[in-house]
């Protein structure tokens, strides 16, 4: 269970395709006409009038930020400048309206009233520096119109049959890995690098009037409200003088502009070092993107421009904003901040970690705001996403699950998708159990399951007749999987002859939790039992009736071996109590006698067994010793030969002990994240892990940070010398590791 709020993934491309394929249109609900006017105080009056042709969702939407393209059938923008006027035709002109939508409890969506989440992104009016005022007032009037008609827009959104997917656990949204930092951390990078433009002289001239803003910016800050593809920066003005065609005003405190830009990866010469790679990859730097149309490099979403006397009018501020628009679009390339460094197609020094090196890259962000609609810069997240091994993301977007840092409560995090975790951890873990050969194993990333694709011999077991017989599993009946963020081992229909010709069928299920614990002054991944096992047994009813006492005795022995980890001679009272329980649990279903031993039953049987803690420790040590001996036969590629497996399975032992020994090897392998390439072969490493777990001494075992170096070596943040020191680890829809960025083994003072 988790306390995360559900995450809603919006698929705008699928929404548009579905509506187009089914010829679904809702344009009949949009208003037919529009009208808006604005009366200036000194310079201009403006009027907007016309009729609508269509409103359409576009595939530019990201996350909960749809983009609505509103096309004008016919209309005009009338600008009056005292004695003169200009009438601009708007036939077939489109306006792109961006917004944020919030889900309601009744399945509908609403648009928050916060001004920065509702804005005009672009329009098709042909503009130049000479007529920016036309673009400004078209957008201003249109935005006022849309705000006055927000209920119509909400109705349009709610009728659009939006295709969504609700995700309870964390999701990388189709990406293989994600390297993330908080907005606050990114702002510390920006402040430290000091690469934002500081001094400005912004000028806008129109009809012999000139408006100038001259001053200095304080540190630019990444902030919330953008859709993921676009990134927003709050640009605080430290001090400025505003010259409004000869009238000069001084800026008051808390003046700022909120701008929005796109980012992109640029080719670069190699300037970073991946300590885990050969540094032969192609470097890309994530920077602000500039366009061919320099008037559209930067969007000013909103602003607060005030003077110390409070004398400037709204109209004055409009013209000042145009001056700043000119300046930002002309000078944004001076913002030389590199937000991330990536080495693409890098060769790992240790081949076993090649799967962590990016072969495709992207970026994204997600905003988190407080209950008071204030930016939560610690939980808001900026991410560099990647695909590895030439995998492809079939639904790529810049949307990011905004809950990652809310869960870790750290400044940085790294996520690995469950399909990768299955392929590179659990698959090897099941191979290491030596229950199965490499030829018999298959991974299903859709069900997050590793299983056997052929019938396998599980091992010899002594039956009630004193004979050593084979126990076997049919295809698909041995499973190691991820379920509800737990690693689950399951055996279904494990079958052998129990004696007197009776064939018994056992199911076994055990859940394990992957945690991160402080051991030997380092963070160590630990796979520990989550709860008691569940055991089920069935036999044909006719065989039960003919051999009940023998079957009950055999089932009791097997169940105790599964609970204790070995077959043992128990006191008569323990066997008697267990026998009564088995008989009481027997039910007849479709000609079969079935017995289900739940977790509560297992706890009672463990108690009734009379086995002391000292005896359990002895069993545990014995099983660890056997597991270590078995591990010596694992080759350096993590496999065991079929001949060796056959020899192991010929050694008779109780089913419970065979499972317990295999689990020792599974748990050792599943947490062996950072140990590859330490000069030992695979078997030796596994033995070290088994011994470390047995002795609770991890001094010779690499911590999780050795693995983290492999994860982030080719993906680095602006502070290239910092490393992610892991303090948090959890399976939560992804394998999530969180921590702090530290430099020279000391916390970064930024």
Swiss-Prot record:
Claim: Lipid metabolism is one of the keywords in the record: no
InterPro entries, alphabetized: Clostridium_P47 (IPR010567)
Keywords carried by this UniProt record: Lipid-binding, Virulence
One function term, GO molecular function aspect: lipid binding
Induction statement: The toxin locus has divergently transcribed operons maximally expressed during early stationary phase. This is part of the orfX1-orfX2-orfX3 operon. A longer botR-orfX1-orfX2-orfX3 operon is also transcribed at lower levels. The crude toxin extract was isolated from cells that had been growing statically for 96 hours (at protein level).
Function: Part of a botulinum neurotoxin type A2 (BoNT) locus; may be part of a progenitor toxin complex required to protect BoNT during its passage through the host gastrointestinal tract. Binds phosphatidylinositol (3,4) bisphosphate, phosphatidylethanolamine and phosphatidylserine.
Protein name: Protein OrfX2
Organism: Clostridium botulinum (strain Kyoto / Type A2)
Source organism phylogeny: Bacteria, Bacillati, Bacillota, Clostridia, Eubacteriales
Name of the gene encoding the protein in the UniProt record: orfX2
